Amino acid sequence: MAAQARAITLPTLPEPLEACASQTALVVIDMQNGYLSPGGYLDLAGFDVSGTPPVIERAAQVLQAARRAGLMVVHAQNGWSPSLAEAGPRRSPMWHKSNPLKYMRAHPGSQLLIRGTWDHAIVEALQPLPHEPVVHKPRYSAFAGTNLEMMLRAHGITTLVFVGVNTNVCVETAVRDAFHREFFAVMVADATLQAGPPSVYESSVFNIQKFFGWTATTADMVAFLEGLAAPGAEAIAP
C-alpha cells in the first residue's frame, strides 16, 4: 500500500518535523555482515561489534513499520566489485583511508565488502524485498557515485529517514549529503551504531540535531509509522 498523500508531523528532535507521508522514504544504510557480524570487516579491523544485535532488532522494527505504512524503502550496500576498480588506486584518498582496503592489502586473499561474498551480504533481518531498490555505493555516502538522488527525485521524495551503520561514518555522511541536496533528513539514532567509542555517536547526534537534520528514537518512530499503516496491514517478511 502506498503512503497516503497527507501532511504528517514526525516525532523528531530538536523539534517535530512536518512532512508528507507520500514524500517520505526510509533509507537503510549498510546493514551488512561486514559491519554487524563477528568475523566481518569491522570486527577484523578492531572495532567493537558487540552492540550490533539490538541495533539490528531496532532497525528491523523501523523497516517493518515503514513497510506497513507504505513508505518507499531504499537499501544502501557498501562495497566493490572483485576487481576493486571502484575503490581506486594509490592516487585515491580512499586507498589510504578505507579500513577494509588496508586490511586486504595486509592480508592477501581476504575479501572484505566484495560483492558476492558473505561480508558484503545484507543480514537476514534486513533483507530487501524484491521491489525495494538496492543502491550499491563505493564510498561512505549513499549519494556518492550512485543513482540514489535521481531515484528519490523521480519518486517525489523530500524527506528521508535513516537507519543503519555506522552512525559517525556512512550514516552521518549520508545525512550531511542529503541536507546539501535539499532533503529533510532524520536519523533514528538508536537504530544506528557507531564505529568507535560512544563519544563519536554522541557527536554525530549533536551534529545532526544542530546542523544537518533531525533525530528520533526507534520507539517513537515505530509508534508513529504504525499510526500511518492501514488497519490490519501486515509487514511482508523478507
Locate the predicted segments by residue:
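A short, glycine/acidic-enriched catalytic loop
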Residues: 38
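Short glycine-enriched, charge-decorated loop/helix-capping segments at active-site entrances
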Residues: 41-51
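N-terminal nucleotide-binding beta1-loop-alpha1 segment
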Residues: 29-30
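Catalytic-core segment of enzymes that process non-peptidic bonds
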Residues: 75-84, 90-91
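Glycine-rich loop(s) and the adjacent beta-strand/alpha-helix scaffold that form part
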Residues: 56
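Short glycine-rich, polar/acidic loop-and-turn segments at beta strand-coil junctions
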Residues: 33, 59, 77-80
